[in-house]
A protein has these predicted regions:
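Membrane-proximal helix-turn-helix segments that form the acceptor-binding/catalytic region
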Residues: 113-116, 120-124, 137, 152-172
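Catalytic cores of nucleotide-enabled group-transfer and carboxylate-activating enzymes in metabolic
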Residues: 39, 130, 143, 165, ...
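A short, histidine- and acid-enriched strand-loop-helix "catalytic/donor-clamping" loop
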Residues: 12-14, 94, 113, 127-149, ...
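An aromatic- and histidine-rich active-site surface loop
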Residues: 81-89, 102-125, 131-140
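N-terminal subdomain of nucleotide-sugar transferases
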Residues: 1-69, 177
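Glycine-rich phosphate-binding loop signature in dinucleotide/nucleotide-binding domains
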Residues: 96-102
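A short, charged, and often flexible helix/loop element on the N-terminal side
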Residues: 60-91, 146-150
Length: 181
């Protein structure tokens, strides 16, 4: 059986939208000859309310690796768990890829910044990776036209980082066709 590493900062007991896509992929991949290894952030670092009933839906014996994240600060400077756990996710992903026979890395986004782990792993190990767009990364936020605003910076940063994330991707999928055109 081939092995796939799924890097998803949120996973049950989180109940965010991206969680369900990763959860269902991981549930059905074994039927197609793929053994999923989930890499996520420990739920102690989630900001959302946890749903332990959702956790009960996970297949018995599913391998889930958890990392820590930097806590949310007051004032809230960085909320995105993909940023708060980026270094920890990247380090653990590299360990898994180097020490196990990982055939593919699947990265559902958001969290958008986690997609940058794909090219890093590719450069370090040659492992192929794919990015699954649940939401578009580059889009205009309300207020993006206001120069030097938070949304202006976010839009510019997304336009600069996204090409770096997808440059060596072997696969790009999306919920809507426009995401990957």
């Amino acid at each position: 059986m081939k092995k796939i590493l799924i890097i998803t900062p949120h996973y049950p007991p989180s109940n965010l939208a991206a969680v369900h896509r990763s959860r269902l992929f991981a549930q059905h991949l074994p039927a197609f000859g793929w053994e999923p290894v989930l890499l996520t952030v420990h739920e102690d670092f989630y900001e959302e309310q946890l749903d332990w009933n959702l956790h009960k839906l996970l297949p018995a014996g599913q391998r889930i690796e958890k990392v820590r994240a930097y806590p949310v600060t007051k004032p809230r400077l960085i909320g995105d768990i993909g940023l708060r756990a980026f270094l920890q996710l990247r380090k653990r992903a590299l360990e898994i890829v180097q020490n196990e026979q990982i055939d593919f890395v699947y990265i559902p986004i958001p969290s958008f910044y986690v997609s940058l782990i794909g090219p890093y792993l590719y450069r370090k190990t040659g492992v192929k990776y794919g990015i699954d767009y649940i939401d578009p990364w580059v889009h205009v936020f309300p207020g993006s036209e206001k120069i030097l605003s938070r949304h202006w910076f976010s839009t510019r940063l997304a336009k600069w980082l996204e090409p770096k994330a997808i440059k060596h991707a072997s696969l790009i999928t999306g919920v809507a066709e426009g995401y990957y055109k």
